[in-house]
């Protein structure tokens, strides 16, 4: 399970989940990606379940990049505890995901295999997602055509 090795503060405020992602919203490492369409918290367990779903489907064919990291501690108070007495103990770690954030990337597989792997992965996510392919610049397409001739 993913979690930070050490943190500056053990407990953090909840924050706001609105707005779009300004960073991490383009495909950077692989050729295909899973992009968030809404904001939310994704737990370390959900990230691990998604990673396993993707890697099981693509087998040894491709490579997977996880673009989000659960660095926010979520606290909980024990059951049947009266209010007061301070904030609860850290219970789990979540990644804050905004609309448009690239969460997972795949490379080295066919578009059909990537789409199916991301479809299976999307079922593990608590937010709506979409399949995204890397934008190929027009100049790169022209050089590929020239090399083929």
Curated annotation (Swiss-Prot):
CDD domains: Ribosomal_L16_L10e. This is Large ribosomal subunit protein uL16. GO terms for biological process: translation. Keywords: Ribonucleoprotein, Ribosomal protein, RNA-binding, rRNA-binding, tRNA-binding. NCBIfam families: rplP_bact. One of its GO terms (cellular component) is cytosolic large ribosomal subunit. PANTHER family: 50S/60S RIBOSOMAL PROTEIN L16 (PTHR12220), LARGE RIBOSOMAL SUBUNIT PROTEIN UL16M (PTHR12220:SF13). Binds 23S rRNA and is also seen to make contacts with the A and possibly P site tRNAs. The lineage of its organism: Bacteria, Bacillati, Chloroflexota, Dehalococcoidia, Dehalococcoidales. The gene is rplP.
């Amino acid at each position: 399970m993913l979690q930070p090795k050490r943190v500056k503060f053990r407990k953090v405020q909840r924050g706001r989940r609105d707005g779009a992602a300004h960073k991490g919203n383009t495909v950077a490492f692989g050729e295909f990606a899973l992009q968030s369409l809404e904001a939310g918290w994704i737990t370390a367990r959900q990230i691990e379940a998604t990673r396993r779903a993707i890697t099981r489907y693509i087998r040894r064919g491709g490579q997977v990049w996880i673009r989000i990291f659960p660095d926010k501690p979520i606290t909980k108070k024990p059951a049947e505890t009266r209010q007061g007495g301070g904030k609860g103990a850290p219970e789990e770690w979540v990644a804050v995901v905004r609309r448009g954030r690239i969460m997972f990337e795949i490379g080295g597989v066919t578009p059909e295999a990537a789409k199916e792997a991301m479809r299976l992965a999307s079922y593990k996510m608590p937010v709506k997602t979409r399949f995204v392919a890397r934008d190929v610049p027009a100049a790169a397409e022209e050089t590929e055509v020239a090399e083929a001739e």
